[in-house]
């Protein structure tokens, strides 16, 4: 059991007539316009650019797959609320807490997939290993926004300055 997932371990041979499902990500029919803003949410499931930390998000094509879904399935929303962005070094215990490289790599993958060049807002107030998720992965929420459609007001972010006030899994 981990992260709310259960696993069944088979102890004997068995046969099954179960047919695998062919589930595909949904594609939105919502389209933005001059007077309609589009907003989406996307859980990136601990995305990070460090393939040396045990998960190979770059080598396995996760950045490109996510970018393709944002462009082709979500139709490049004006604002995207992101969950579970890891810091630049993933689960490496090196004190890094910034996710600017993770977010920049995602922005570049989206642009390469035919989407806009998003700007991003990182949660720069993360303390090392203080917010739950994969140990020292320093997951956080973040936002991508299309600067051709919306803007960010400097100083409008609120900091959690007391890192002990952040929720943890422990």
Short names for language-model regions:
Residues 7-170:
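Divalent cation-coordinating acidic motifs and surrounding scaffolds
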